Amino acid sequence: MGQESFIYSFVARGTMILAEYTEFTGNFPSIAAQCLQKLPSSSNSKFTYNCDHHTFNFLVEDGYAYCVVAKDSLSKQISIAFLERVKADFKKRYGGGKASTAIAKSLNKEFGPVMKEHMNYIVDHAEEIEKLIKVKAQVSEVKSIMLENIDKAIDRGENLTVLTDKTENLRSQAQEYKKQGTQVRRKLWYQNMKIKLVVLGILLLLVLIIWISVCHGFNCTD
């Protein structure tokens, strides 16, 4: 997946865009703004519009809209995963305070680079994120099957012991899927920490090189 998979992103309160980010030129912002005007303002939902080989993905929650424009080759699930990260970060930084009073585009400088970081993270970890999404879907499916089978068994008046055995079997499947999801999340955390440690090591090395060059070795004196 290339870095150009994500084209444009914004966060809006109602129809007012508070922060946006893009590295591309084009009419994506105006089309996204038009889509924003058409979104139901009261519902907490997810929407995707298709236009000119691109998807305009929206996550609406508590009066705020989170949008990302992506190439249509990128799965909707990955785009929504990006929006979930942006939403969580935005609410953590501004929820209940600055977000409710900010004016149009006033958070560009602060939150624009943050959206870029989330874009890069999703692109770099797309494979692991898709696996995690798949595991979550499997868990949801198992839960649905479990409830459906229990309802059918009750309707048929099955023996309670048989019903308990079936429930335990489905519960074991759900636990296995949950275990897989935990393993994927742990792998993502270790990879992210590894990157941070490498960057820290490089910075320390640069400081050491500068120190040696300025002091002509380790014998700095006042």
From Swiss-Prot:
For whether the record's keyword set contains Membrane, the answer is yes
The protein here is known as: Vesicle-associated membrane protein 724
Transmembrane residues, as ranges?
A: 198-218
Biological role? Involved in the targeting and/or fusion of transport vesicles to their target membrane.
Instruction: Return the Gene3D superfamilies for the record.
Output: 1.20.5.110, Longin domain
Q: Superkingdom of this entry's organism?
A: Eukaryota
Tissues and organs where the protein is expressed, per its UniProt entry? Expressed in flowers, leaves, stems and roots.
Q: Which SUPFAM superfamilies does UniProt cross-reference here?
A: SNARE fusion complex, SNARE-like
